Amino acid sequence: MKTIATVVLVFAMMIAGAVERPRLDVYPVKDGRAIVALANEHPAMFVVSLNDQEGTLVFHRESKESQTGYRKLFDFSGLKDGRYELSVKVNTTTVKKPITIQQGTLNVGESEFRFDPYFTWSGNVLKISYLNFDGDPLRLSIDGEWGNLYDASLGREFNTMLGYDLSALDKGNYTVVLSGGDKQYVYHLKK
């Protein structure tokens, strides 16, 4: 049991060390405007999105080249009162910041981090690790060239670490899909 706990701890530390740690700040200035600033340790491509409380996309921008920072003055004055979510995706890390607009005043909440799952394929074993911050019911499916081979509900556990021995599968291309809530992560492997 001690060995398993050590392996899990080492695996979790490897994942934590491999992800980006971008910093997202929103500084309200005046008249419904705010400076949005992103800083990242390493140059990377990123996607900035702003969604309203219904999930409707209000703003979207993808970087055209890798960079370590982004700064833009946003004008929120034309938006209706309500809750919004500003998110920035840098590689496999997403930083979310809730923003509430009420009578032209911006209130900015704390940053929340989300990480894409980690997939690895080696020696006929598929390993998956995922931190389910939102507590969504998770589902895993494995599809081959001939259709669905495996489909299972994984529950709502926060820390999901799985290993699948796929040695019995024929050679070919396979698609692994981990989904939960409105998120879907796809991993392709060739056996």
Where are these regions (language model features)?
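Short, compositionally biased P/S/T/A/G/V-rich stretches that sit at domain boundaries
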Residues: V19-V26, Q102-Y118
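Short, glycine-anchored, charge-dense loop/turn motifs used at functional sites
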Residues: D52-L57, Y84, D143-L149, Y174
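Bacterial Sec-dependent N-terminal signal peptides
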Residues: M1-R23
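C-terminal tail/sorting-segment detector
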Residues: V90-V108, P117, G180-K191
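Surface-exposed interaction/gating patches
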Residues: Y118-L149, F158
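Short, surface-exposed loop/turn motifs with a glycine/proline- and acidic-biased composition
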Residues: E65-S87, R156-V177
